[in-house]
A protein has these predicted regions:
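Metal-dependent phosphoesterase core characteristic of DEDDh/y 3'-5' exonuclease domains
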Residues: 6-11, 39-156
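Conserved RNase H-like, two-metal-ion catalytic cores of nucleic-acid enzymes
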Residues: 1-36
Length: 156
């Protein structure tokens, strides 16, 4: 993602568990990203409700005997707090599917996986990524002026 605009720089890569295995996919993620670099800012996770991904990745890495994947131990950007604030401080109704054009939550993904409906999983991931990026770009374009407005309230 562009640090200037919040827009995508490359193409979306979907690592598909049904074409490989979970351990192999997680290993590929670790090899092909700078996640394990000692420099804290080499890989900055950006997402919505990163606690969900954190818990999943941490547990699955442990199960597979992979290096610890702790996406919350270094700098990260989680837009969930913005969604909560936009909903007046309420957690309820602050999911990405409630504040963007994302049509549904991810509850059906395990079902689709179990019955082999992989095209629906890919469509879901693409929709989620598209709506997240659209929201992220929108925030990047508006927050600088919000900061300027806020700065005008400073008394010093």
């Amino acid at each position: 993602m562009s640090p200037a605009s919040g827009d995508v720089i490359g193409r979306l890569v979907i690592l598909k568990a049904w074409e490989s295995c979970e351990k192999e996919i997680m290993g590929k993620f670790l090899r092909e990203t700078s996640f394990l670099d000692a420099y804290d800012f080499s890989f900055i996770p950006v997402g919505y409700n990163l606690g969900f991904e954190h818990n999943f990745l941490k547990r699955r890495a442990e199960v597979h005997g992979l290096p610890d994947i702790d996406i919350l131990s270094k700098p990260f950007i989680d837009l969930r707090v913005i969604g909560i604030l936009m909903k007046g401080g309420e957690f309820k109704g602050s999911g990405l599917n409630k504040i963007t054009g994302k049509e549904r939550d991810g509850m059906m993904v395990p079902v689709w996986n179990k019955v082999g409906d992989y095209d629906k999983i890919v469509e879901y991931v693409e929709m989620e990524a598209r709506e997240f990026v659209r929201f992220n770009v929108w925030l990047y374009s508006r927050f600088p002026s919000l900061f300027i407005e806020w700065k005008k309230t400073w008394d010093y």
